[in-house]
Amino acid sequence: MKQKHTLLTLAAVFAAALPLTSQAAVTRTGTIKFTGKVTAPSCSVDGSTAMAIPAINVALGEISMDKVQALASRPSHFKAHSITITCTGAKNLTVSLKALDSTNTLTGQTNILKNIASGSPAAGIGIALYQTGKAISYDLVSGELLNKSTPSTETITFDAAFVKDPAVTTITAGNVQADLPFELSYD
């Protein structure tokens, strides 16, 4: 009888353990989700959104014809201007002037922008950009305004002035407008 009792006890133990083993074999599946965002280095100009380069307007105002100087001299009547560039994560920032010779500049004069004003344009007058406070004008076709390996917030300054076209002896009064393409590049 003892043997029967032992067998019943063993059967009861196995029967009790059977639900435990079937519960341990249950499989559940799930998903681990990973999220994030990869941002590109960016630079903005004068508060614009990244990748949008705004039109930068420089109003030179009015000047008497007799005050317009030749390119070689430091202008006495100029407009100081600055452009702020803010970069996040960018490297090797370069701001280059990209005027097209004879399209944006006077023929043979890579330092003088051509007057493209319509209506009543001034004749014999262009616009030049100078290093701030100096008589050194920028080459508008291939000049570099800024070159910085680790930029953050950078300010470019320059002086803009009306200048005489050296190929013209007589200038006339009128409107002046010029466009200067530039390029902002960074890694």
Where would I find each of the regions flagged by the language model?
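Mature extracellular/passenger domains of Gram-negative fimbrial/pilin and adhesin proteins
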Residues: 2-6, 21-187
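Bacterial N-terminal signal peptides
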Residues: 10-17
